[in-house]
């Protein structure tokens, strides 16, 4: 099973066509950020303007996710192992895909952020955690790291508003404490991250995707790191 969307048939006619750098050779761009930070919006923007193959989070394919949000302690380990195995498959697929690819949330986030948060809150038992982390560490040794990581960050009130507006049933009862814990882990992880260059974007205002001047400035920031 593949978790990518179809390649866009046409590019945005209003965007400056001089930016062809992203298609000159194969690149792997990763988009990271908390729940509701705007990852899918950014991935869609990149795919509309460039011939980039997107790879998305396999949320809908996870048979444990709905149960996980209802009872995290019972279903955390099952859900995280599912994500880990499917993210590994996605990494294999994107490495075999010709041209530049962009991924909505990486396997690193699954382990370093989400699984870690669950273990620290005692929703994953120590024995299960040790098994999970050994599997993750083994997988990481065979992965191609991103050429660029785009880290999206915005205030907690903005995250909660976006989560409410998009109305996903399984997300409606996410505790605020859980979101705050994820954000702390994200910030700590970014400080330790060394696989590639990182561009941090504040997404509280999405003008950088709707205003032409801001869009060009945004792409120039990314271009400098590729």
Region spans (language model):
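P-loop (Walker A) phosphate-binding loop of NTP-binding proteins
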Residues: 34
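A glycine- and Lys/Arg-enriched "phosphate-lid" helix/loop adjacent to the NTP-binding pocket
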Residues: 113-185
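NTP-dependent small-molecule kinase module
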Residues: 160-226
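Conserved lysine of the Walker
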Residues: 39
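Conserved substrate/cofactor phosphate-moiety recognition/catalytic segment
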Residues: 48-86
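Hydrophobic anchor at the beta1->P-loop junction of P-loop NTPases
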Residues: 31
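Glycine-rich phosphate-binding loop used to anchor ATP phosphates in small-molecule kinases
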Residues: 75-144
């Amino acid at each position: 099973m593949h978790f990518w969307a179809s390649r866009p048939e046409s590019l945005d006619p209003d965007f400056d066509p001089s930016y062809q750098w992203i298609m000159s050779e194969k690149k792997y761009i990763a988009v990271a950020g908390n729940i509701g930070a705007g990852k899918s919006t950014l991935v869609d923007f990149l795919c509309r303007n460039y011939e980039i193959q997107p790879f998305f989070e396999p949320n809908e394919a996870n048979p444990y996710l709905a149960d996980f949000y209802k009872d995290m302690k019972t279903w955390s380990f099952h859900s995280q192992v599912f994500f880990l195995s499917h993210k590994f498959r996605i990494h294999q697929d994107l490495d075999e895909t010709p041209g530049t690819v962009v991924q909505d949330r990486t396997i690193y986030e699954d382990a370093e952020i989400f699984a870690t948060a669950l273990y620290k809150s005692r929703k994953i038992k120590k024995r299960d955690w040790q098994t999970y982390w050994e599997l993750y560490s083994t997988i990481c040794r065979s992965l191609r790291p991103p050429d660029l990581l785009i880290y999206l960050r915005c205030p907690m009130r903005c995250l909660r508003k976006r989560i409410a507006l998009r109305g996903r049933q399984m997300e409606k009862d996410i505790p605020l404490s859980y979101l705050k814990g994820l954000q702390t882990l994200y910030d700590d992880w970014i400080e330790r991250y060394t696989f590639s260059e990182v561009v941090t974007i504040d997404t509280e205002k999405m003008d950088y995707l709707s205003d032409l001047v801001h869009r060009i400035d945004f792409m120039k920031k990314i271009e400098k790191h590729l």
